[in-house]
Regions:
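Short, polar/acidic, helix-capping and beta-turn segments at strand->helix junctions
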Residues: 2-119
């Protein structure tokens, strides 16, 4: 018997592959990775060539996460761990700046990884 509940919200980008936006299993919600897609147009927002553009992309990712959290009955405040993937580690300080506006102390645990590319 499965106690899984598959979460789908129109307020965040739909899945662009063979995965669910999120899955609730018991009291834990597992959220799939997010990229800076506008949920309506399904287009990547912002320009990754400027700090302002990257900041808007980071804000969009957290907005998407917030919608999935809320529509699964939770909030960003309940996030325990974040895995962050960046194609340019020089933008790491922007992640910190945005996180300080999105989360309250104490912050969730976090890993940040530099990668060659993202979808």
């Amino acid at each position: 018997m499965s106690n899984r509940n598959y979460i789908r919200t129109e307020r965040a980008p739909k899945a662009i592959g063979a995965y669910s936006q999120a899955v609730r299993c018991g009291q834990t919600v597992w959220i799939s990775g997010q990229i800076p897609l506008d949920p309506v147009s399904m287009e990547v927002i912002g320009n990754s060539d400027s700090d302002e553009g990257v900041r808007s992309q980071i804000e969009q990712v957290f907005a998407n996460l917030n919608c999935i959290c809320k529509d699964s009955g939770g909030s960003l405040r309940e996030i325990v761990k974040l895995n962050i993937f960046l194609t340019d580690m020089s933008h790491f300080h922007l992640v910190n700046e945005v996180m300080e506006t999105v989360f309250e102390k104490p912050y969730p645990s976090r890993a940040a990884v530099g990668v060659l590319s993202l979808p």
